[in-house]
Amino acid sequence: MPFTLHDLDENVTPTLERYCAIPALSPHFDPDWTTSGHLESALQLLAGWVRSRLPEADVREERLEGRTPLLWVEVPAHGEANSDTVVLYGHFDKQPPLGEWSEGLAPFTPVRRGNRLYARGAVDDGYATFAAVSALEEVRRSGGTHPRCVLLIEGSEESGSPDLEAYLDALAERIGRIDLMICLDSGALSYDRLWVTSSLRGLVNVDITVRVLERAQHSGTASGVVPSSFRIIRQLLDRVEDATSGEVLLPEAHCAVPDWVESATRGVAEEFGDVVAQEMPVVEGLELMGRDGADRLVRRTWKPALSVIGLAGAPEPRQAGNVLRTSTTVTLSLRLPPLADARAAGEALVRVLSVDPPSGAEVEVTLTSAASGWAARELPEDLRRILDEASRGSFGGPLALTGEGGTIPFLFQLGQRFPETPFIATGVLGPESNAHGIDEMLNLEAAVNLINALAHLLSHYGGSQ
């Protein structure tokens, strides 16, 4: 008897909803996180639940000076003895609410509607700890065996994982050799099969501030004489992006697209249609970038893209007076293809934006984060077979692989340390999950299916193959 939605509701959902109610914002969004205590509350809740479910596990709340905490769970091998170690990764920090949620929904008030759970952090990535533990319980309940498993659940992923390297160093001896790495923070193009991520984009964030005046001036007096700080921002952005096509102009932000990516995206588009266009809640009449569904998949996963994600220095429209403002600040997000060097791209971005300021304006550019992307090595044939069995048995459909447009710094960091280790990045951030946006949603049926798929993988991997 596999893990069911009833099992989830009995053993997981109540605690998951308590987690969802905690505003455990990542430190980038809550600089006073040590004072607010929300990350600590989330950590304690998860640790307590894991101890109640796996009493034989070594559960520790790891702490390093000046770092967000990390949840360590070590579960010894069960059944047939083998020396393999599987590391399962997730995170408990959250994105901010972003804005007003739909009627009846709120970021930190979990709402169940049918088999959907709405709350910030439900799918990204609160479910991960519960899924990993439930899968291990399911293996044991069904009489199976599993290798030694280590759960690493961090608290700074949504800030670019600045604390993770320090923990990997501190825990390296305790972790030991890693034979399989599973990340539960990735996405899916549909809920009818197990999706394994073949690549992730990198990310560079910078803040640009342009100052033109010591104090604001009446626009009737200063306009036409003093250049607008916003216009200078526009000029600077034109150095980085073609304003008409959206193409990124920095050579360091590009890499060659492998032939297999082109063929794989064509295959996905032929089977699922224009999935990228289908999932975007665009306004009527908007023309999307890209020639077709396959091209849009490539653009989302293997091409750079620039977005303005923050703006300061301007009042709300209702408060706007006829004033030439002193300055404008924007935060840029530059997504990078999987094989681009984030550090090199970040340095190039800062350099291009800083040199020869238009009109002699005061320009300050700050690189706030840089995380390289990741491309998976080809899965070993036996592992791919196990995953396909898990997908068909749990979801109903065959295993599928796709690239993702987001960034998980952990995969690049572990990939550098363990280049020969197979990596599986998967998750239930599927259609309408709205991670990072309003109305974030966890599809509970998909979570159940993933738990069963994960249980199959753990019980058939390693010494029990």
Question: Where are the regions a protein language model picked out?
Answer:
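N-terminal helical capping/dimerization or prosegment-like subdomains
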Residues: 1-100, 327, 346
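An extended, acidic, His-containing surface patch that forms the Zn2+-binding/catalytic region
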Residues: 43, 81, 190-191, 248-327, ...
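Active-site metal-coordination/substrate-binding segment of hydrolases
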Residues: 82-153, 449
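Histidine/acidic-residue-rich, glycine-tolerant segments that coordinate divalent metal ions
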Residues: 146-228
